[in-house]
Amino acid sequence: AECSVDIAGNDQMQFDKKEITVSKSCKQFTVNLKHPGKLAKNVMGHNWVLTKQADMQGAVNDGMAAGLDNNYVKKDDARVIAHTKVIGGGETDSVTFDVSKLAAGEDYAYFCSFPGHFALMKGVLKLVD
């Protein structure tokens, strides 16, 4: 099984993937985030945040309040399963999480929590056999 994925977020506020599948056979899964754009992180920064679908809006709202210094993720937010830091154009970051944190049949969402981005920059993560 492929236990990692590469995803890019650009200056047009788009991820290049709308869906990520994670195999149950993976013990851990790694997300490699790349920003192929030119704009700085304080202007057009992107991160990759994973929550349950139902938790997305709350995590986004609290993340905005947390600010850029905290990567727009509330400190110790139990709803956030995994997240990268916020990166700007030309930068990369990765995050690895335990697949055991995912439950079969649950709906998971990934998104960028930079203010105003999640409406366009989001996708679905699925646990598969």
Curated annotation (Swiss-Prot):
Please list the residues that bind Cu cation.
Answer: 46, 112, 117, 121
Q: Which Pfam families does the entry mention?
A: Copper-bind
Other remarks on this protein: This organism, previously called Pseudomonas denitrificans by some workers, was characterized as a species of Alcaligenes.
In alphabetical order, the GO MF annotations are:
copper ion binding; electron transfer activity
| Gene3D superfamilies reported for this sequence | Cupredoxins - blue copper proteins
Keyword check for Transmembrane: no
Q: Does the keyword Metal-binding apply?
A: yes
InterPro entries in the cross-refs: Azurin, BlueCu_1, BlueCu_1_BS, Cu-binding_ET, Cupredoxin
Question: Where is this gene product found?
Answer: Periplasm
Q: Which domain of life is it from?
A: Bacteria
**What is the disulfide pattern of this chain?**
3-26
The protein in question is named Azurin
Originating species: Alcaligenes sp
**What does it do?**
Transfers electrons from cytochrome c551 to cytochrome oxidase.
